[in-house]
Amino acid sequence: MKALAKLERGPGLTLTRVKRPEVGHNDVLIKIHRTAICGTDIHIWKWDDWAQKTIPVPMHVGHEYVGEIVEMGQEVRGFAIGDRVSGEGHITCGFCRNCRAGRRHLCRNTVGVGVNREGAFAEYLAIPAFNAFKIPPEISDDLASIFDPFGNATHTALSFNLVGEDVLITGAGPIGVMAAAIAKHVGARNVVITDINDYRLELARKMGATRAVNVSRESLRDVMADLHMTEGFDVGLEMSGVPSAFTSMLEAMNHGGKVALLGIPPAQTAIDWNQVIFKGLEIKGIYGREMFETWYKMVAMLQSGLDLSPIITHRFAADDYEKGFAAMLSGESGKVILDWTV
């Protein structure tokens, strides 16, 4: 089958032919319709330090996808041939303490599709049936293909009660922008998002952010004054991994505020602990999606009117993957979709 793979230890990916995956007794085989390019895939493309330490070579990659089930293992129940599915990209062990307690998103033995094992940038993908998630007919293939990052945004944004709250989001990448849309959808009062990329800040405005702030030109304090905020933000969602952004967030938080961290800062990042301790801030690290509560909430929000369509800005045939990666690397894109059916 056709697949997009890392064949050599260096930058780039190659469209090649690989063996169609085998289907175990508890697996489903998915014929891929659409995939989306993730920031993780950009790290793999660039072959940065993280990728060099993490990605097996050779291996085909990718973990954001939608397709249909074309084959099932003999032990699979609850699915049928022809079901349209996406899937949880974190394959968990099932036997550690957290898995046995129903907290699979905290599994210490997690294996990532397209990161530690063969991925979805291919015509077919085999995964455990447990990880597959049926997509309702009213949700398009394009939207279903971005459920993985949409899930990151949902898990982060819904970590705390947002109803009537003032929310600060640092980082207007696709996940940050989707988090802004989610926050408004569920009842936040003011949703302010910061970045230095005007293209992505404009996407955030289209998705419903109250204010999209280019912090290279505009003061966050001035924006807070314009919004008549006198006490600081109630909830912070850190999506950038940029130390200066996190510092600004801590300074802007109200006493008793809550902060969720999805962005990954450098390992030795220093912060002002006085801001955390004397303000009584609650800080929570976010990884992946809650299985599968996050997935049900994603579907429910789309079915109740959440519009994520502006975040999908580019579409290409899978054979034109280089154009898709170029769009992502340009910094002037939202989500980029690759079509494996043409």
Curated annotation (Swiss-Prot):
List ligand-binding residues for NAD(+): 175, 195, 200, 262-264, 286-287
GO terms classed as biological process: L-threonine catabolic process to glycine
Under Pfam families, the record lists:
ADH_N, ADH_zinc_N
Active site, UniProt feature: 40, 43
Using the UniProt record, name the top-level EC class of this enzyme in a single word: oxidoreductase
Instruction: Look up the record and name the cofactor or cofactors this protein needs.
Output: Zn(2+)
Q: Which HAMAP family did the record assign?
A: Thr_dehydrog (MF_00627)
Know the name of this protein? L-threonine 3-dehydrogenase
Q: Which organism is it from?
A: Burkholderia ambifaria (strain MC40-6)
